[in-house]
Amino acid sequence: DKYFKKYLDNYVFLELMPHYIKREHLDFMRGVPMPVKKEFLKELAGEEGIKIQYFIEGMIDLIGLDSSFRYAPQYINFLNYVNKDIPKVIVSLAIDFAKEEQLIHAAVLLRAALRINRDDPDALYNYMLVCRNLYNDSDDDDYIADLKMEVFESLKHLKEVRPEFAMTYYFLGFAYINAGRYSSAAREWKTFVSLSGPCEERGEIQGRLTELEIPVKIEQAYMDVINGRWEQGLAVLESYRGDEMLKGWWPLYYYLGV
C-alpha cells in the first residue's frame, strides 16, 4: 500500500443524494462517502451534476489504492450491484492502461479486482506482469524488492487457483532464480515444460534447465553440508572448485566457505 496511498490526495468525498439511495434500494450506501477525482468537481455546477460513473471509477481506485480503506466493503457491494462481472471489466481496463504504459493505474485497478475476488486468475497474472514491468523500470532497491515479493506471492497464489496454467511456472522459475534457489527454479521449469505446448518459451526453458544442472548439484551439496552430511556435500563442492566454467561464480565459493 505504501507506494499507492499517496494518490489518495487526488480524491474528495461526497454523499449520494437520499432520493437516489431510495430509488435504487441502496440502503447499505447511506452515509457512505463516495470518492471522486478532484478534476471532476467542476461538474457539480452543471445541470446534471457529477455522473455516477465518476463515483464508480473513484470506488475502484480507492479499494486499489488502500487495501484497508474503511468503506471498501460497501464499495465492493455497490460495484457488484452495478455489475456482477465487475472484476472482468476492471481487468480489461487495466490491460488497456498497461498497453499504454500507464502501469501505476493498471496496478491500482488490478489490486482492486483482487480485493473483490482474490482468486481471479486473470487479475493475478496481469498484476504479476505489471509489477514485473514496474520494478524493471526502477532503480530503487526497496521498491524493486517489494514488487518482486508481490510478483512471487501473486504467482504462488495463481499456482493454487489455476495449477494447469503453464506460464505461472515459467515466471516462478525466474522468481526462484532471482532468489538464488536453483532447485526450486528447476522444479518449476520442468513443470512448465510438461504443461506447455510447442512455443518459443519452451525451447528457452529447456536450454535454461541444461544450464541449471550444475548449480542444482552445487545447491544440493550445500544442503547436504547444512544438514550434517559433510563428507557427501563437500566432496561434490570440491569437485567443482577448479572448473573453469565456474571460475568467479560466487555461490560455489560461498557454499565452500560456509
What residue spans do the PLM features occupy?
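TPR alpha-solenoid repeat register
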Residues: 123, 168, 201-205, 216, ...
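TPR-adjacent "capping" and linker segments in tetratricopeptide-repeat scaffold/adaptor proteins
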Residues: 44-47, 73-91, 203-216, 243-247
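Canonical positions in the second alpha-helix
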Residues: 113, 157-158, 192, 240
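Short coil turns that delineate tetratricopeptide repeat
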Residues: 84, 118, 162-163, 180, ...
